[in-house]
Amino acid sequence: MSPTTQGTLVLIVTLLMLVSGIPVAFGLGAIAIAFLVLFQGFDALHVVAETFWSGLDEFTLVAIPMFVMMGAAIGSSPAGKDLYEALDRWLYRLPGGLVISNLGACAIFAALTGSSPACCAAIGKMGIPEMRRRGYPDDVATGSICAGGTLGILIPPSITFILYGIATETSIGRLFIAGVLPGLMLTGLFILWTVFIIWKRGFRSHAIDFRYSWKEKFQSIPKIAPFIFIIVGVMYALYGGVATPSEAAGVGAALCLFLAILIYRLWKVQQIWLILRDTMRESVMILTIIATAVLFGYMLTSLYLTQTLAQAIADLHANKWMLMFLINIFLLVCGFFIPPAAIILMTSPILLPIITAAGFDPVWFGVILTINMEIGLIHPPVGLNIYIVNAIAPDVPLAKVMWGTLPYVVCMMLAIVILCFFPEIATWLPNHLMGVAIGPK
């Protein structure tokens, strides 16, 4: 059987697995084992355990449970409420000030958790009811939280960048630094759209009828101080060359756990157990997907499917920007149906040779890939953030939540276009801080 026929068969079976509802981790592993046995015989089984183990035998992977613990500790505390209230006291007089406060809180929270669902849930629980109380339209209130939550996988530390770095052997430190400016740019685009739509609709918040005193404003600063301390501590450890990403993640996890226990007084055994349980549950899920995705990638390589696809694309002699356009469309469609972790681990090893052959920077592409994953988080049918927000505000029709996210999807697409025209937005900072790198690390 030719590699093209084998590849078509693998594609069909994989798509059937994804739409069937089978957990991605188990589905990828089963498909990999089945096709290895089918085309290479039972002798191929001896590499399954070895490949599964080697997929997890990386010190870098320690960063994943550590960053997950950061999100679990902060998410279990009233930290999101404090952060949101502090920003609101300073920004409430601006047009759309409450939405801007939410987006700013999402950006800061993203720098603490690296998780989109955690960011969306923590800020949304306080932000959505308050925006609706002050008269903001439901589509703006829910759509802005959905979009702001996606910043959790772009603004470092980002679990998405860790997965991409592992899958493509790209420096995770460079990826983290590369996500800073695009993350701030995307936050700015979200804010600009919010101000524009509020101005166009002539909306006047109920908040205009009252004022916070300067005393109340300055009293809110200590609520933000612990977040800034943790962010600066982790970033200094990471970008100052003091620690590796895994070590910096450990520092961040310890600081967030101390914040939850000492400041927010989550010192009961049951409360700490819930944090550890959530950390273990999400970490095991991600690590299992990584291990089976490595096995899936081994199957693709051993059957020469990856090489055949790369050669077929190279034979097209397409313009590199047309190639990038097609890759973005492919990733966008994948994001509609497949969770981000699975997309990254399944597609990155296949796409990276194509990207580097076309002359694109793998770090820059990691940022482009992540923004595509952000779109998938607020677009049905997967659209995890949509369902989180709908659970927070169940009386808002799901269709209205979806319509509210569409302008922010356009903002993300615009961000991708801007990064294509000005790749230095993603590459300048890592090149400036770490020196110019060529290809994977």
Model segments located where?
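Alpha-helical transmembrane segments of multi-pass membrane transport proteins
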Residues: 1-441
